[in-house]
UniProtKB/Swiss-Prot annotation:
This is Basic membrane protein A2. Changing N271S: In strain: PLi. It holds the Pfam family Bmp. It comes from Borrelia garinii subsp. bavariensis (strain ATCC BAA-2496 / DSM 23469 / PBi) (Borreliella bavariensis). Changing P107S: In strain: PLi. Belongs to the BMP lipoprotein family. A lipid is attached at C18 (N-palmitoyl cysteine). Changing N194D: In strain: PLi. A lipid is attached at C18 (S-diacylglycerol cysteine).
Length: 337
């Protein structure tokens, strides 16, 4: 009898160890998405939300959405783990360190992060990162800005200075200089992605200095800039970011530098659910060639001839005839070539 009980106990232990979180073998898969701040930012986080909603429409999954902040990342991720998540998406570079930490602590769970900032050290095999050549789309919008500016002064409004936002900034500035070497460009950072009022304040000052086009990469701060452009009216323009933001101010938004976070999330998650395979331990990089970054066509503000020029530039970037800079060092090198 004792031997029989031991055998049953042993089989139970084996069963429990094989049916841990992360497996898709039984039950409805649970996919979680955690963001810094709010999903309703009209750009980056919202794009991720739209992407995962499309996955839910196609697959039978349980979806958990979590809005978080720096001080609660670990506890919120612990909660998603305890809830039985198979796959957890972390949206934004601010999760870079914590993504590695939790993936090492929980090898049975799959993790995926958008916009990680990693150097050469190994990535855990249950973690995958999505990175973007955002500078390529921004190069095109910078070219447009320089071509349509009436004052010869354009600007860039960033959230927090760093690798991710710098790609937009220096791509934009390079595209503008490619179009017009004499264009004047002013860049400002508000130190936050969640401060609408700071975006309003800085944008107001930029417009008063004679800048007529502002490219933002500031999330909710950019919403503040859009509000200012809309209030000031004709002659005050914005270039949106991540998604097509023209609906927010149709008469003021010339175009948007798109970075389709939602599409990349959708592609990877759908493949994971279809195949039950997870190829982690790596970074996946998207750009113009993959159709994930680009710009929004707007015949109302972008003349047909200019659009043709942009299409030609896109081909040159895809064919690597133009290598778009992504930081200060590569930008300065670009200007010398």
């Amino acid at each position: 009898m004792n031997k029989l009980l031991l055998l049953i106990l042993f089989e139970c232990i084996i069963f429990l160890s094989c049916s841990g979180k992360g497996s898709l073998e039984s039950g409805i898969p649970k996919v979680s998405v955690i963001v810094n701040g709010t999903f309703d930012d009209k750009s980056f986080n919202e794009s991720a939300l739209n992407g995962i909603k499309k996955v839910k429409e196609e697959f039978k999954i349980e979806l958990v959405l979590k809005e978080s902040s720096t001080n609660s990342y670990l506890s919120d991720l612990e909660g998603l783990k305890d809830a039985g998540s198979n796959l957890i998406w972390l949206i934004g570079y601010r999760f870079s360190d914590v993504a590695k930490a939790v993936s090492l602590q929980n090898p049975e769970i799959k993790y995926a992060i958008i916009d990680p900032v990693y150097s050469e050290e190994p990535i855990p095999t249950n973690l995958v990162g999505m990175t973007f050549r955002a500078q390529e789309g921004a190069f095109l919008t910078g070219y447009i800005a320089a071509k349509v500016s009436k004052t010869g002064k354009i600007g860039f409004l960033g959230g927090i200075e760093g690798e991710i936002v710098d790609a937009f900034r220096y791509g934009y500035e390079a595209g503008a200089k490619y179009a017009n070497k004499d264009i004047k460009i002013s860049a400002h950072y508000i130190g936050s992605f969640n401060d609408v009022e700071a975006g309003r304040s800085v944008a107001t000052k930029m417009y008063s200095d004679g800048i007529d086009i502002i490219h933002h990469a500031a999330s909710l701060g950019g919403i503040g800039a859009i509000e200012v452009a809309k209030e000031l009216g004709s002659g005050h323009y914005i270039i949106g970011v991540d998604e097509d933001q023209s609906y927010l101010a149709p008469n003021n938004i010339i175009t948007s530098a798109t970075k389709d976070v939602g599409r990349s999330l959708n592609i990877f998650t759908s493949n994971y659910l279809k195949t039950n395979t997870f190829e982690g331990g790596r970074l996946i990089n998207y750009g113009l060639k993959e159709g994930v970054v680009g710009f929004v066509k707007n015949p109302k503000m972008i003349p047909f001839e200019l659009e043709k020029e942009i299409d030609n530039l896109s081909s040159k970037i895809i064919n690597q005839e133009i290598i778009v800079p992504y930081n200060k060092e590569s930008y300065e090198k670009f200007l010398k070539e």
